[in-house]
């Protein structure tokens, strides 16, 4: 028997058959899916994802020299064959068969790139795609002999149907919980099913890439034992907080400073106590200066201790500057930089374009992930494969979303839908953290966020906010708005009165104009500095230090 090849190593010394690759992806999909109680669904995706390579034309392509491969890249399609096989075999039974076959066949067809099943003109792209499959009889014959016969597919399929039924019941209960009108139910059901489709695709893409990287570059993915890591991180966190306390007590403090320090510790204690609650969607409303980052981290670590199945802790913020400010705090607090991934557009890494770094940097395998709201939303909604593959990492995790009020209004509905899905179907524990909570549960929304009870992690919010009132806002009333040059001149006059002045503007151009004008009009002894995202991350950090 001649086994068809899936990959040949770059040094041309090692070969991986389609059967070997399928088995590797099957095992990875099973492990990832098992954590979500969908191991069989994920394994079916793995079994069929590459059977389209079981044909001579693809085997010849894999064995061809590099120039021939480059000329044929993208022209020998293989992913639709598995989709066609599943669709024709299983899209004939009851409604659950139809739904399951559609989920698996789309994941298989889209694992090298997503596509719309229906275009704007109403044509069904999916049907057209599988009708164009070539060499299907050869694929069926070879794959049944080399791959499919090795698996008890009927048993796996029956178990997959049971898994999908359980998922469907979770989604139905979520829709009923939202008390939607009849006109809303179908839309919500379709949205949540699409979320689940993306989840299955995420597991398949990530497993496919992982097994391929393991063979091609002999890269082993880093395995973190979350329970062990979080236990060590919790001990390190306690030592870190004790260090902060000792450092604080060394210096003579004012009554106000002592009071604020005491209140921060009280808030942190409330967060730790709240960790005994079950997985849900909660609000952490802490006044500015109340220590949101450390309080949120203390809660997450305590939750991981109370709920041993917790896999990751995510810290998400809207701005790179906030991430840069807080990621160092988190690294120091947990005591090991290797546990913490910082993922945003300004992160600078050596050999960033190397495949190994692409694999390790962006797969979100680390126990602690600090990323931006943009990257978070990309993971949930982008059509990019590297974004889709991360989605399943959010399952069984604590997700802290800081400054959630900064979310664009146009994102609210889809955000609410997806948070409800992550919590209910993916067992994610979500904390919306800010000093000014938006009304995401507004009852007039078509899809309000479904907060758990009790909703607020901190009690006596009104009292806490009064305790942190440290700023007095004095409006400078003018009939007309300042021009930038006028604003600079007003700041220049204020320099004689105040030792330090902070100016916050809403555009980089405005910052540049005011900065340049101030340098022209103030005395040389006055130090003028500016910070914008036009500066690279390292430059900003040096300025702040």
List the model feature ranges, each with a label.
Residues 2-12, 18-239:
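Accessory nucleic-acid engagement/destabilization modules that flank
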